[in-house]
Amino acid sequence: MKVLHLSDLHMAPWQRKKQRFVRELADLEPDLVVDTGDNLGHRLGLLGLKAAFEPFRGVPGVHVWGSNDWWAPQPKNPFAYFGGPSGVPKQPERLDTEALRAYLDDLGWTDLNNRTARVTVCGVVIDAFGTDDPHREYDDLAALGPGLRGLRSRKVRPALTLGVTHAPYRRILDAFVDRGADLLLAGHTHGGQVCVPGYGALVTNCDIPREQVKGVSSWTHGGRTAALEVSAGLGTSIYAPVRFACRPEATLLTLTARSA
């Protein structure tokens, strides 16, 4: 099964090259798209996002929000990130999150913001759950309880349990492992965005270990271990459009059955 992980597009309507790149990812013929948020980078960003995502219409997908699906970016001092995870900006501009939700629903993608769902992809049953953005503390892990109990009461057992969030804070990853996730997907970090060759990321913008700021690794908690993939994402804030030694990325994961 091919899973396309998209994150942190921070889309603005004039970003035609990025829109074209995302459209062309449909040629990879993914079986499932996982969107881990921060889709919008401008109050008119949905226009560009529609241009990018339209080729995925009909492809199963799941999504969660990042803070930039709720609030427009603002100018800030980039050196402030060295003092720890970024805070809440003053008087941010509210984005049209409901229009974004309606569009992703129309594509056929399932909303996992503090929700659970069962999806079937290529005949494979997947139980999925997710949270709204932990960076803004919009996550509500308690809200997952009834849905998870309902999924586990079904006769058909899932082949895979997927945990999806925007920002990979330790408390969220721990909770996902506790709730039975086999695979964890997140974004938010931009892979550090500015990295030092031979050393890696300087900051993570959350509390995940620096060496797990991007890529595939594992996460262990309470005696269980799950696979973890953190995307470096495809975009940046329009007010800090710089990456160094950290290329933008979309990730195609190929999942195979465990050997008997």
What do the PLM-derived regions correspond to, one by one?
Residues 6-7, 32-38, 61-67, 112-115, ...:
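Active-site neighborhood of phospho(di)ester-bond hydrolases with catalytic His/Asp-centered motifs
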Residues 76-109, 115, 121-165, 170-174, ...:
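Binuclear metal-dependent hydrolase catalytic cores centered on His/Asp/Glu-rich metal-binding motifs
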Residues 118-120, 130, 216-218, 252-256:
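Short, well-ordered beta-strand micro-motif
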Residues 62, 168-251:
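Conserved beta-sheet core of the metallophosphoesterase superfamily
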Residues 39-42, 67-71, 119, 133-136, ...:
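Solvent-exposed loop/turn segments at secondary-structure junctions
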Residues 1-10, 125-135, 162-166, 227-233:
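Active-site-proximal beta-strand elements of phosphoester/diester hydrolases
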Residues 2-19, 40-43, 71-92, 137-140, ...:
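Acidic/histidine-rich helix-loop elements
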Residues 16-120:
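Core catalytic region of metal-dependent phosphoesterases/phosphodiesterases
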